[in-house]
Design a protein with these regions (language model features):
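Helix-to-loop junction immediately C-terminal to a conserved catalytic motif
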Residues: 29
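Conserved ABC transporter NBD signature motif
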Residues: 5, 37-48, 52-53
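Catalytic Walker B motif of ABC-type/P-loop ATPase nucleotide-binding domains
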Residues: 130-134
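The feature captures the beta-strand-to-loop junction immediately N-terminal to the Walker
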Residues: 11-16
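ABC-family P-loop ATPase nucleotide-binding domains
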Residues: 61-117
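Helical segment within the ABC ATPase nucleotide-binding domain
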Residues: 145-157
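Helix N-cap at the start of a conserved alpha-helix in ABC-type nucleotide-binding domains
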Residues: 19, 141-143
């Protein structure tokens, strides 16, 4: 499996459930051990410079409920001790921007506010790479649209790149610069979004006008695999 994310870009990871999106992200972070290969982040071998690299990475996994009974202020006090480049002024800026109440317990936040809080933590140590696993899962359309807008602003204003896995392909239609399609644990295609969309024109039907959406590409690609399996 091989793909590359450039500076100040958003890459979307797509693939059906079980394809390997979350495992890929966990492998990058050394949360699971890959059987072979290597991960380079900031042009350094992650296995050799993990501690240094993690100072420059922010992670947001959807559905995380760590310290659910603790107030945000307490979680922040613990978190900031792990980062040498923690910026309290930056943290307060994002707490205010995201309208977060530090006196609230983590479990009292909505799913959207939980993601915003995790983003605030990540951006407060000036992360240059955000790794997001299904961050918009379970959110209503308005909250999802707001987060996508935030992602675009982060990349533009914070000298940051985003690696973003999701099964909601319409989110990536709106915000991704690059797309990586994972199928059965392998990269089927990884390219800039326009190049990616054009590379699947062979899946178009006579009645189709314009390029296929990411959802249509996934459905037709996976359907083709089902047909191949049925024919065996």
């Amino acid at each position: 499996m091989s793909f590359c994310l450039g500076s100040q870009r958003i890459m979307g990871l797509i693939g059906k459930n079980g394809a390997g999106k979350s495992t890929t992200l966990k492998s990058i972070l050394n949360m699971v051990s890959p059987e072979s290969g290597s991960v380079k982040i900031f042009q350094k071998d992650f296995s050799q410079y993990e501690k240094e690299c993690k100072q420059r990475i922010g992670v947001v996994f959807g559905g995380i409920d760590f310290y659910p009974l603790k107030k945000l202020s307490v979680i922040t006090a613990v978190t900031q001790k792990f980062y040498t480049d923690w910026d309290q002024e930056q943290y307060q800026k994002y707490i205010k921007r995201f309208a977060l109440d530090e006196s609230k317990k983590f479990k009292e936040l909505s799913n959207g506010m939980k993601v915003k809080y995790l983003l605030a933590l990540a951006l407060s140590h000036h992360a240059e790479l955000l790794i997001l696993d299904e961050p918009t899962s379970g959110l209503d359309p308005v909250s999802r649209e707001e987060l996508l807008h935030i992602f675009r602003q982060i990349v533009k204003n914070e000298n940051c790149s985003i690696l973003f896995s999701t099964h909601i392909t319409s989110d990536l239609d709106k915000c991704a610069d690059d797309i990586t399609y994972i199928q059965n644990g392998c990269v089927l295609k990884s390219a800039g979004k326009d190049t990616f969309l054009h590379s699947f024109e062979h899946l178009k039907m006579p009645e189709d006008t314009g390029l296929l959406t990411l959802e249509e590409i996934m459905l037709r690609t996976e359907r083709s695999e089902w047909d191949d399996d049925a024919a065996v």
